[in-house]
Amino acid sequence: MNIKELKDKITDYANIVGEQEGVEIVNVEIYPGGKGLTLRIFIDKEGGVTIKDCENFSRAIEAILDVEDPIKSSYTLEVSSPGIDRPLKNKKDFLRNIGRDVKITTKEKIADNTFFIGKIVDVGDDWVRIEIQETKIKGSKKKGKTELLFIPFNKIIKAQVYLG
């Protein structure tokens, strides 16, 4: 089994455990480590992930991996939160962060800008609405009025929670 097939199989197991444990699987990574493979699984849930969530998920996924034995070599399992600075990629990510400040870069200009910092106020099927606090064009700062702006998901290059 190649790494991609292994990752797909482990992602399937992780999704089953995630559903049982009430967490969402954000990402599964597999890469060569010092002694065998390192398997890193990032989990999240509304309100954030606790250490106890990571422990419970880790125990449950280990039980499945021990029985199913998809990894034939030794491996290290790491389970953690994706962190506050992870990219926002889909509707669920934006919904989870309603009320938070975000920075968004778009592939084409919207309201004469491609970079926005604002608070998520609403999320639709294919858009996010933010209350703009500041806009930036190619490195130069320009203070803008507070306004609501709809940004289609398909126009977003990068989005993440803004801590500034």
Curated annotation (Swiss-Prot):
Entry annotated with the keyword Cytoplasm: yes
Subcellular localization: Cytoplasm
Biological-process GO terms, alphabetical: ribosomal small subunit assembly; translation
HAMAP family: RimP
Described function: Required for maturation of 30S ribosomal subunits.
Family in the record: Belongs to the RimP family.
GO CC terms: cytosol
Protein name in UniProt: Ribosome maturation factor RimP
